[in-house]
Regions:
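Serine-hydrolase catalytic-loop signature spanning alpha/beta hydrolases and amidase-signature enzymes
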Residues: 104-107, 128, 154
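Short amphipathic alpha-helix adjacent to the substrate-entry channel of hydrolases
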Residues: 110-129
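Gly/Ser-rich "nucleophile elbow"/oxyanion-hole loop immediately N-terminal to the catalytic nucleophile
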Residues: 156-175
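Alpha/beta-hydrolase active-site loop
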Residues: 140-161, 183
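Short beta-strand element of the alpha/beta-hydrolase
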Residues: 94-102
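N-terminal cap/lid segment of alpha/beta-hydrolase-fold proteins
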Residues: 32-92, 141
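Active-site loop/turn elements of alpha/beta-hydrolase fold enzymes
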Residues: 102, 126, 133-135
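Glycine-rich nucleophile elbow surrounding the catalytic serine of serine-hydrolase chemistry
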Residues: 173-183
């Protein structure tokens, strides 16, 4: 998947969090500051028992994200002060999925429920977009629903340029994101 092999199963979580290309995206990699602090002493190979994540998939995902950021691929599009979309576009007039990660409306678990899933969907021939929606004190109705609407509006407005098929798409989510997707309709 990734061309770059900057990270390996022996890389410490600390090294990932403090990698220059991820400086602006630490919260997206793992939102909880407490968990980020605890993880720092462990290598990525501990991800299976620490986080329930497949180590190979995690390492491939981190290397792919690192490549995208360093190659200046459009990685994040802010749509509001605390919301936006992460495009994972393969083009080719393929359909798309808008992924809405969970996080109990307190945070957004973007790495495992967004980025990892988006790359898996890309491999299956789908364009994918990961929604970052308002959480915490900003998660009052209808703010998160408005953020989903903003993501979809941005996708539809930019679909021709990205070569994304807007006739066939899905909105899906995990946990709080699943609730949000179901609320969307």
């Amino acid at each position: 998947m990734a061309r770059n092999s900057k990270f390996s199963k022996n890389t410490l979580f600390y090294q990932v969090f403090h990698s220059p290309e991820f400086a602006d995206y630490q919260e997206a990699l793992y939102p909880s500051r407490m968990i980020r602090s605890l993880l720092q002493i462990y290598p990525l190979r501990a991800s299976r028992w620490l986080l329930g994540l497949d180590t190979t998939v995690l390492v491939d995902t981190l290397n792919c994200l690192s490549d995208r950021i360093r190659q200046k691929t459009e990685f994040y599009v802010p749509l509001g002060e605390s919301s936006g979309v992460y495009p994972f576009v393969i083009g080719g007039r393929k359909p798309f999925v808008l992924l809405i990660p969970g996080g109990a409306y307190a945070e957004v678990c973007t790495l495992n429920e967004g980025f990892m899933m988006a790359l898996a969907l890309n491999r299956m021939g789908w364009n994918a977009f990961v929604c970052k929606y308002r959480v915490g004190k900003e998660a009052h109705f209808p703010n998160p629903q408005d953020d989903v609407a903003d993501c979809l509006q941005w996708i539809f407005q930019n679909a021709a340029q990205m070569e994304v098929n807007t006739e066939d798409y899905a909105v899906c989510g995990f946990s709080a994101g699943g609730h949000l997707a179901a609320s969307w309709g």
